[in-house]
Amino acid sequence: MPTETLKTPVAETNEKGESQDPVYLRIRDLVYQSCGIYHSEEKLYLLVAACKRRMSNLNSVNSGRDYMEVLTNPQKRDVEIRDLLNQITIGETCLFRSQPQLNALHNVILPELANERSKIGLKKLKVWSAGCSTGEEPYTLAMFLMEEKEKLLRDWTFEIQATDLNDNSVEKARPGIYGD
């Protein structure tokens, strides 16, 4: 009587030789559909690590397959995707982080913008800081624009909107209090 050997699917591996369980590819696609963050094959291990951190906080979730069930459960989906996004967003931030960009804003962008808008009587500037993390960049912009208000942008009004996928970071940004 012939014996049949059960074949287990071989999981793919990334450049680091780490297993890429196909369920994590589905989670990657779900994250991408939810917020536009895409983890390439080379960076999938970062998503897997974030999923494992989330799984350690959940009862009865011991595998990627279990976690996928949580992510697709209509009652749990929104909260869990938000919590997963809080794990995968980078959150790198500091005041006056990118001097070359501030120089470009000061030397090129604002003078051109002020000239064009003044011609048509518009003296309002709206800025959106997407991916603001804990808010250092939008506060940098506010300080920068207040300095420009004394020179190039007299009589102008400013509005800065700052957003981030990470709710925890946004909560830290709200008070606008920064230490050394």
What kind of region is each of these model predictions?
Residues 2-128:
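Conserved AdoMet
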Residues 121-180:
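Class I S-adenosyl-L-methionine-dependent methyltransferase module
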